[in-house]
Regions:
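Short, glycine/serine-rich, charged loops/turns that create anion-binding
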Residues: 12-14, 22, 99, 114-117
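A short, hydrophobic, proline-anchored segment that marks a local hinge/packing element in signaling
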Residues: 95-102
């Protein structure tokens, strides 16, 4: 598991997390180790598929795993991040970016999520891309 670089509120505790209140309803995004996410519909899944080696994607396809279509994969590669947005009263939007190691392999992804209403996709994309790049640099010993 890769942890993003610490922000000012987490410098004292490497296991800290951040939570907030939603003013108009309940929102819960609780992803624990072992949680399975769809590769075709989630920002995490789209990033992992888009930046994986072809043989990994081929193996998943052969196993019948639902994958994002070629148009989505091309867009994720072009942008350097993936989004998932679904409208509704209690839906969550997310932006994810790949963590690339020294061998130029995608070894994971970082994501930000929040309620669909008011979610600033562009701002969150900038934040998560920068955090993923910083995490990758740290893994390579550059920070």
């Amino acid at each position: 598991m890769v942890r993003p670089p610490r922000s000012p509120f987490s410098t004292e505790n490497p296991r800290s997390s951040f939570g907030g209140w939603s003013s108009r309803g309940v929102l819960r995004a609780d992803l624990r180790i072992g949680t399975q996410l769809r590769l075709d519909r989630t920002a995490f899944g789209r990033v992992l598929v888009s930046f994986s080696r072809p043989e990994i994607v081929d193996r998943l396809r052969a196993q019948g795993v639902e994958l994002p279509d070629d148009q989505i994969v091309a867009e994720v590669r072009r942008c350097g991040y993936a989004i998932s947005e679904v409208e509704g009263p209690r839906t969550v939007s997310a932006v994810a970016a790949p963590i690339i190691d020294a061998q130029n392999e995608c070894i994971g992804a970082l994501a930000l999520s929040g309620p669909f209403t008011g979610f600033d996709t562009d701002k969150c994309a900038r934040i998560v891309v920068a955090a993923a790049a910083a995490s990758a640099a740290r893994l390579r010993g550059e920070q």
